[in-house]
Amino acid sequence: MGPKATSGTRGRGKKVGTKTAAPLPKYKDLIVEAVVSLAERGGSSRQAIKKFIRDKYAVGAKFDGQFNLAVKRGLEAGELAQPKGPAGSIKLLKKAAQPKPEEAKRAAKPAKRVVKAAKPAKAKPAKAAKAAKPAKPVKAAKAASAVKPAARKLAKPVVKKVGSKKVATKNAVVGKKSVVSSAASKKLLAKKAVPKKTAGRKPLVGKKVVAVSRKPAAKKLAKSA
């Protein structure tokens, strides 16, 4: 095995050292690493994946058998897929895809910035609320002081005017009622008294005049005879 390794890697003395020193992970992990590193849209072929693993790791004589077995297990577990059939390219499914450590760090950095920006936003409304609290009692006190003198000034004259008006109106009404009642009583008395006096006198005057006029006529007739 020693001469074959040296003959197949002439001019690559450094890589031979890495192959012997690097530990060999599971074949399934080797396939996933190869597909992620190659980063092909439709997946990577078996030959490309095997070449990537052989160039990076020192594999044994049973590499092909272990490789095929790992692919079969990955397909059954739903981690790998072959869209073009058993002889086609190998592709990773979303479940098996793992983000690189560099991409995870980049995704974590914007999250920290968002948290820092949110802190001053929360503090601003608290400051505004504190500044607004002392202003409310001052306005309420000013409004109360302005209302009290106005209410006192208006209350006194209104009470006096109302009392005088009521008294004047009551006196005027009472005076009118007394005048009307006295005038009405006088008219009624006059009407009742007049017809009694005139009704008895008129017929007596007429009878006396007739009697007086008849007497001289009889005397004149006697003289003429």
UniProtKB/Swiss-Prot annotation:
Lineage top rank: taxon: Eukaryota
Major subcellular location class: nucleus
Residue ranges with Low complexity bias: 128-147
Entries under PROSITE patterns matching the protein: H15
A GO term, aspect molecular function: nucleosomal DNA binding
GO cellular component term, pick one: nucleus
Keyword Nucleus on entry: yes
Stretches assigned to the H15 domain: 23-94
InterPro entries xref list: H1/H5, Histone_H1/H5_H15, WH-like_DNA-bd_sf, WH_DNA-bd_sf
Keyword vocabulary terms for this entry: Chromosome, DNA-binding, Nucleus
Basic residues biased stretches: 107-127
GO biological process terms on file: chromosome condensation; negative regulation of DNA recombination; nucleosome assembly
Localization per record: Nucleus; Chromosome
Functional summary from the UniProt entry: Could act as an H1-type linker histone.
Family under the similarity heading: Belongs to the histone H1/H5 family.
Designated name of the protein: Histone H1
